[in-house]
């Protein structure tokens, strides 16, 4: 407490002397911090915004304090000053003055808080205790559900636990958010420009895609970007995304993280061996390999084992919370991540929103964008396309073809579609050619890039054919 003497000292002493009361587990809280916040607001109304960014009424432990803070918010909203007299009058009109301790308690709050200088720190304490209490409440709820499952399976109980914890994590205020002075923004911007100027990068300022023409369009996959790769079945979206991962892993030392919700890790590894070794993936899958194939694969394995920077998580039905926590762990252990790839977005789930698919997808895409910003890493998420494009004469995808497209299109920084004409036209003149259609790029041009598709190797390569109009 900021004052010279604590509030309710007699009550505290009685509790300490009573062994039965002392043995009770009291939820974590700080009466002194709460009183200092309330008293500080009465002393300096200008600190309201600092406090309101950190706490809400429910963060206060005692009911009287919740009522007082709520009434302060009402006064602030109406443009009225917050002081001993106005607050007492307002509480009196609401019939709550006696329930909060009367005029005497409000006067004590004001008197025993000498200044509002440290009110932000006190508000942080109040919020911290509130989060811990909420965690305890959720833990008790989960325990009760375990003792009395009411027909729910262990999977259902895990979903319940995850969703409750997820809500707590999402509700926490991020102190790094909010307005920044232009001086701070300029400093960071100039530092980034100087870094780019001093480092030779051939125009690639992000993660190198491994594809020259794509790098020219995008300058690489940028940190903090959510990148959507979408295509109809058989176009090679998993292959393309894996090639991006492989190229990133080979061209840098930072770890790359794959969340494969559809395909087991062994199949992912077989595809990578085929791609990097340029050995027919059918021969790898069936084990029909000759000496040259084995030599190529052994060489690739040696490189992969030397770098050891590819991580694969093939857990199914992952939630945004699980993806975030696992990515954080890898980033913490290795000092960062080079690239995250998720195959595919629609297989993720949010148990609390499972009844509304549109809201669920919106939460997933929002969470992936937040993850990209938090870890300052490009996140590549694969997405399905609506079947409706099959009815068009020109089956090249557009942004509106994204399944549950609204939120995905809004959150994405870069959207790339894969189109191979030979999938629809057997005698196409474009056999072996893939079009990477950039449908959206927040900080760059849209257009089309051609790549060569080598399906037998599960690989896209740089296109070396004649020039074409990509617009």
From Swiss-Prot:
Domain SF4 helicase: residue ranges: 200-467
Source taxon at top rank: Bacteria
Region annotated Disordered, chain positions: 1-26
The keyword DNA-binding appears for this protein: yes
InterPro entries per record: AAA+_ATPase, DNA_heli_DnaB-like_N_sf, DNA_helicase_DnaB, DNA_helicase_DnaB-like_C, DNA_helicase_DnaB-like_N, DNA_helicase_N/primase_C, P-loop_NTPase
CDD domains documented for this protein: DnaB_C
GO cellular component terms, A-Z: cytosol; primosome complex
Gene Ontology BP terms: DNA replication, synthesis of primer
Pfam family, one: DnaB
EC number: 5.6.2.3
Family annotation (SMART domains): AAA
Catalytic activity: Couples ATP hydrolysis with the unwinding of duplex DNA at the replication fork by translocating in the 5'-3' direction. This creates two antiparallel DNA single strands (ssDNA). The leading ssDNA polymer is the template for DNA polymerase III holoenzyme which synthesizes a continuous strand; ATP + H2O = ADP + phosphate + H(+)
Example of a GO MF term: ATP binding
Keywords: ATP-binding, DNA replication, DNA-binding, Helicase, Hydrolase, Isomerase, Nucleotide-binding, Primosome
Family annotation (SUPFAM superfamilies): N-terminal domain of DnaB helicase (SSF48024), P-loop containing nucleoside triphosphate hydrolases (SSF52540)
UniProt-annotated binding residues for ATP: 231-238
Family as reported in the entry's similarity comment: Belongs to the helicase family. DnaB subfamily.
Subunit structure: Homohexamer.
Role: The main replicative DNA helicase, it participates in initiation and elongation during chromosome replication. Travels ahead of the DNA replisome, separating dsDNA into templates for DNA synthesis. A processive ATP-dependent 5'-3' DNA helicase it has DNA-dependent ATPase activity.
Protein known as: Replicative DNA helicase DnaB
Lineage: Bacteria, Pseudomonadati, Pseudomonadota, Gammaproteobacteria, Enterobacterales
Encoding gene (name): dnaB
